[in-house]
Amino acid sequence: MSTSVKQTEARAIAKYIRMSPFKVRRVLKQIRGRSYKEALMILEFMPYAACKPVLQLLQSAAANAQNNYGLQKDQMIVNYAYADPGPVLKRFRPRAQGRGFKIKKPTCHITVSLKEVL
C-alpha cells in the first residue's frame, strides 16, 4: 500500500555569501509571508545590496518548486526565510608605527522556502 503525498514546499540555500547576516535579515523580514510575485516586486525596488543574492535565491526556489514538484509560481508564498552566520574571514590592515588592525569580513548562509497555497 503506497500513498503518495504531494510535496507543497520547495527551498533553496545560498552558502558563503560575502555579506553580513544582519544586513541580509533586514531584507528577508520584508518578504517573509508575502506571495512570490509580491516578494519579487519588493526585492527589485529596495535600495539594499543584499537584495540581489536574495532575489536570485527566491527565483531559484521558485524554479525548484516548478521543476522538481510541479508547483505553480502564482500560487506560492514565502514560507520562511532566514540568514545564518557563516565563517568570518579575518584580515589585517597595516597601521602606523608597526601596528595592524583586524578587519572582519562576515559571510552568511541564506535559506528561502516557498510553499504552495491551495
Curated annotation (Swiss-Prot):
Gene3D superfamilies: Ribosomal protein L22/L17. One of its GO terms (cellular component) is large ribosomal subunit. InterPro entries: Ribosomal_uL22 (IPR001063), Ribosomal_uL22_bac/chlpt-type (IPR005727), Ribosomal_uL22_bac/org-type (IPR047867), Ribosomal_uL22_CS (IPR018260), Ribosomal_uL22_sf (IPR036394). Signal peptide: none annotated. The keyword RNA-binding applies. One of its GO terms (molecular function) is rRNA binding. The keyword Ribosomal protein applies. It holds the Pfam family Ribosomal_L22. It comes from the Eukaryota. GO terms for biological process: translation. It is found in: Plastid, Chloroplast. Keywords: Chloroplast, Plastid, Ribonucleoprotein, Ribosomal protein, RNA-binding, rRNA-binding. Belongs to the universal ribosomal protein uL22 family. Part of the 50S ribosomal subunit. NCBIfam families: rplV_bact. This protein binds specifically to 23S rRNA. This is Large ribosomal subunit protein uL22c. It comes from Rhodomonas salina (Cryptomonas salina).
